């Protein structure tokens, strides 16, 4: 028994009136022509020369739109070259920060404080041991010792070094006496 041919189903077949044409393969000449056109379009895809630095050229198309302000251009506010009296008045009206006055130490208190300074003692010990101090440490020692000398003069305190000077002054007198007396060996 022969069965009749089945008709194609609607979901498998293309809709009526639209036939799928066969794709015909392009020839080498057609491919070359298309490639040349793509290459020509690709050449012109970038910006013109100098487009990065010439902003005016790119704004020609946007002249109908509101032009954006160039951020590289500074303020047009004039800068005063001469100081006016109004500016001085503003400066004087600023509130001055109150500086708390440190309680002044009496010279005796300051002298005892400087004499008991641990940092100064350590630096003087290093100097006695023939060590070289840094510039900051040497400056600190010099300033502190100068202040101690000034305070001692203010208070009328004399150092024991002056006694050594008096002994040195007495020795030349003794030498003169010995020379005048005649034989220096007799006096010993």
UniProtKB/Swiss-Prot annotation:
Interacts with Der. Keywords: GTPase activation, Ribosome biogenesis. Belongs to the YihI family. It comes from the Bacteria. Residues 1-79, 158-188 are annotated as: Disordered. Residues 47-66 have a biased composition (Polar residues). Residues 28-37 have a biased composition (Basic and acidic residues). This is Der GTPase-activating protein YihI. A GTPase-activating protein (GAP) that modifies Der/EngA GTPase function. May play a role in ribosome biogenesis. NCBIfam families: PRK05244.1-1. One of its GO terms (biological process) is ribosome biogenesis. Residues 159-168 have a biased composition (Acidic residues).
